[in-house]
Design a protein with these regions (language model features):
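Conserved segment of winged-helix/HTH DNA-binding domains
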Residues: 71-96, 107, 111-117
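Alpha-helical residues within the helix-turn-helix
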Residues: 33, 50-51
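N-terminal helix-turn-helix DNA-binding core of bacterial DNA-binding proteins
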Residues: 2, 6, 10-37, 56
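Beta-hairpin "wing" of winged helix-turn-helix
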Residues: 53-67
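C-terminal regulatory/oligomerization modules of transcriptional regulators
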Residues: 96-167
Length: 167
């Protein structure tokens, strides 16, 4: 099953929260308390996002974290990569010969296309999409994905065509 790690979930939640914040900043404690996230894990994630240039950290009594760029300029893919490294559906997507079946594999190319499509979709989902979808009655992530997909109809058509060719 393809799914995000809890660390990536927490990072996306934190960035969405910062994008929604009236002041544009929040402490790790404020974010952790609001979403019931483990404080130690969240602190490490926020430090990593700061080190990767997605957040800015302010010290002091009124310190906290804020977005280093506009919410429209930060993608879900950037956040996930900053926390967990690159996104791969299969091990052979990341290493040329990372599989015993490398020489005879018949699904490497279709899976590479699926992997690239997933990366493409994640790169089109912006923190602003997640923020703006928060008030929708539908699932906010579904709404963000729908918005991103509207910009990616061609990718979906290519996948459908690939599937039809294989049948």
């Amino acid at each position: 099953m393809l799914k995000l790690t809890k660390r990536a979930d927490y990072g996306l939640i934190a960035l969405k929260h910062l994008a929604e914040s009236e002041t544009g900043a929040a402490s790790a404690k404020e974010i952790g308390d609001k979403y019931q996230l483990p404080p130690e894990a969240l602190a490490k994630i926020l430090q990593r996002l700061t080190k990767q240039g997605l957040l800015v950290s302010q010290q002091g009594t009124h310190g906290g974290y804020s977005l280093a760029k506009k919410a429209t300029q930060i993608s879900a893919l950037e956040v996930i990569r900053a926390i967990d490294g690159d996104v791969f559906l299969t091990s052979c997507s990341s290493v040329a010969k990372g599989c015993d079946q490398h020489e005879i594999c018949t699904i490497r190319e279709p899976l590479r296309k699926v992997n690239n499509s997933i990366r493409g979709l994640l790169s089109r989902i912006k923190i602003s999409d997640m923020r703006d979808a928060a008030g929708d009655e539908a699932d906010p992530m579904e709404t963000a994905i729908t918005r991103a997909e509207s910009h990616a109809v061609q990718d979906v058509r290519e996948l459908v065509t690939l599937g039809e060719e294989r049948v």
